[in-house]
UniProtKB/Swiss-Prot annotation:
Assigned GO CC terms: cytoplasm
Binding, a divalent metal cation 2: H64, H220, E224
GO molecular function: metal ion binding
Binding residues for a divalent metal cation 1: H63, D101, E224
Lineage: Bacteria, Pseudomonadati, Pseudomonadota, Gammaproteobacteria, Vibrionales
Protein name per Swiss-Prot or TrEMBL: GTP cyclohydrolase 1 type 2 homolog
Length: 252
């Protein structure tokens, strides 16, 4: 498929025009015209770029690309090395950030819910483009049980901040993959029993303790593996691309 046709297909699927983002979504660095082999991964790090080159990929498809709002505009240093390597190897770079978080089937939030056994009830912000979700478990569980489940699914032990009432059972839950810790306030105002995200701030601890809500910091990278993986699998199954997902270790 032509690289611009692939971008059009991804745009049609993920609808980036529907949500305001902090970076451009779509084809960020243009490479060879014909795309057959794609490598997917969470972040367009040099390690992932080199792995894609080793596999003779035509395109790299990621969740975290380049050209973020308020980042230095000059193409130099680490940013310069990455982009120069892409261009020298004629490697296309496609990136989809918030549109991939919120897709109802392929998105990071949807994929995490599926793996944790969460029944999705809706968007925490109350509109279709909400980047945080809420739902429920069919069977209530303790904070320790949910922490264990998260650890088993993501292969990473989460940081669990229990509320002052530590034995509170969890039936209703909110979540936002990546850096969505501040959505705990919306979750608490809705009266949810728990909130899950990738990261945690110092203030999150007190929000959890004082508002009677369990908080689980499960890892930015770990919570966002599965959307880009699902998108690649969809491209392979429905459009015949040769797709390889590569998970570059990141403990954050």
């Amino acid at each position: 498929m032509n690289n611009l046709q692939l971008e059009a297909l991804l745009n049609e699927t993920l609808s980036p025009q529907l949500i305001k983002d902090y970076c451009p979504n779509g084809l960020q660095v243009e490479g060879k015209v014909e795309v057959k082999r794609i490598v997917t991964g969470v972040t367009a790090s040099m390690a992932l770029i080199e792995a894609a080159i080793e596999l003779k990929a035509d395109a790299l498809l990621v969740h975290h690309g380049y050209f973020w709002k308020n980042e230095p505009e000059a193409i130099r240093g680490m940013k310069g090395r990455r982009i120069r390597t892409l261009i020298q190897n004629d490697l296309n770079l496609y990136a989809y950030h918030l549109p991939l978080d919120i897709h109802p089937q392929l998105g990071n939030n949807a994929q995490l819910a599926q793996r944790l056994g969460i029944c999705v009830d809706g968007g925490l912000e109350g509109h279709p483009q909400s980047v945080a979700m809420f739902g429920h478990f069919l069977q209530p569980l303790t904070g320790e049980e949910l922490a264990h489940r998260i650890g088993q699914v993501l292969n990473r032990t989460p940081l669990h901040i229990a509320p002052d009432q530590a034995d509170k059972l969890i039936e209703t839950v909110g979540w936002c993959t990546g850096g969505g810790q501040d959505y705990i306030e919306l979750a608490a105002s809705r009266g949810l029993d728990a909130f899950i995200s990738g990261e945690i701030s110092e203030r999150t601890t007190y929000s959890a303790r004082e508002q009677s809500i369990h908080y689980f910091s499960a890892g930015h990278h770990a919570t966002e593996r599965y959307g880009i993986k699902a998108l690649g699998e969809w491209l392979a199954e429905n459009h015949g691309f040769d797709v390889t997902f590569i998970d570059i270790d990141n403990p954050v």
